[in-house]
Amino acid sequence: MGVTGNVYKFLLVLHIACVILGFGATAFNGLYLDRARRKGGREGATLLEANGDASRVAEFFVYAVFVLGILLVATSKSAWKFSQGWLSAALALYFIDLGVLHGFVRRLQKRYDQVAAQLTEMTGPLSSSDDRPSQVGVLEQLEQRLQLGWGIFNVLFLIILYLMVFKPGA
């Protein structure tokens, strides 16, 4: 096998495809959130629902990135080792990134969806800013925190990508 073998190359193609499909699909979630807020109402809720569905599928590709990465190390015939600093750092950052996704972003997204659904159910025009439902303020705070979470997720991904491409110290 080794890094020049067909099995390694096939796994590498799958690994890269999963990176593109998984992380690429989630890279613009902050933008979708902003767009849904601007659309508002049922249209915004529909946009968020579709984005949520796509993101849940993308997460499986994000998980596959890890599995395929482990297989790449195993089939590299010692070209890559878990003791190499860049690889250990990339793995640690991957798990931190998953922690941001599940412990921060998904938790906030669930709350955001609940509040947005409550707000969508409200009917009748608002006559002044004093009539603004409290849910609007809550949504704005949640949106800011979600934007921060997605930003952190994306920055961590870019650092991991840098480590994978340039392999500092290898």
Which residues does each PLM region occupy?
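Polytopic transmembrane helical bundles with strong interfacial aromatic enrichment
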Residues: M1-A170
